Amino acid sequence: MTKTSPAAWTVAEVEADKGWIYPLSESEGAELIAAVRAAAKKAGPVDRPILDWKRDDFALEKALPTLAAAFREVRDGRAMALVKNLPREGVTPMEFRLMTWAIGLHFGVARPQNRTSDYITEVKDVGMAYRSPTGRGYNSKAELDFHVDGSDVVLLSCYNQAPVGGMSMCSSAATAFDVVKAERPDYAEALTTDYTFSRNGEQSEGEEPWYAAPVCTTREGRVFCKWNRNRIQNAQKIEGVPQLTGLQREAVEYFDTVLRRPENMFCMHLEPGDLQILCNQTMLHSRTSFEDHAEDEKKRTLYRLWLARPDSRRLPDSWAVFYGTSEAGTVRGGMKGHQYDDVRRNFDARQAQAMGMKAA
């Protein structure tokens, strides 16, 4: 089978070549936490409203080349990168959260992620039911389906890991779609037809509760994938939504099976101080269920950031219904939710200008 892109990798390939891992040096890590603490001292406190912070509040220089290389890997390479050695020892949760935000301010425009229009979310179990019509996996400890998030890239920084489970799983949609085309071309064709996705009650004013898009689309030789079983299943329960055909159902089941084949599904435990960066157009991700610590301060905790990137590629036209536009290098994607207000609009405009991007 001919490889269609660097993102079409197998587990054996990413295990043999660890060029997608980017360790920060001691001085680079020290600069990150020093920048956060200096900003908090000058313009703090550290827990001030997150959208009040500006890129220029965080003086970064040494760490930027390593971080930039990781983002290039996500765009032009294997569609995933792991940055290691973010400062963790002696760093408070709020400092770690702000450090994640500071990195985002230097590399894109953060996007809202949920019905409450949050721009950075704490990934922590609060007892939410993942399979409910409004369930979100990041607030549960359940095993998650493979999926992509609603932005150009997603950043996950690890503050605490679970004592048991919670393993991160990544699988290349480019690889899986190549396999499906070779093994079942009828399923591959079905994956390029429209499926319906529920917005899980997070739609903003003027948006429908569901939208339609193909699971797989090829544009300029690249595979773009939207796959989220939970949202497809929830959409089927909404009145007036077109029902999937038998072939469409079989196709996504087969596609998901291919994603989970041992040769395609790469597993890693995110450790405290790790920053995982994934391309949401090509790289599907998931997580195993986990058992947590009893003490709240030890519980599995990550911080999730969705970014629109200044060097983003043009999207397939069918993606514009969710992203707002398919135009490259624009502030696009995210879920505006129910609390998208002037504060958020002003942040988007200010950060877009700082990054030289066109605001939506």
Where are the regions that the model predicts?
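Internal, non-catalytic "lid/hinge" segments that mediate substrate recognition, gating
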Residues: P112-R115
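"Short basic amphipathic alpha-helical interaction patches in structured regions
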Residues: M94-W101, C170-S172
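Active-site environment of non-heme Fe oxygenases that use a 2-His-1-carboxylate facial triad
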Residues: M1-A63, A68-A69, D76, A81, ...
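A short alpha->loop->secondary-structure connector
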Residues: T100-A110
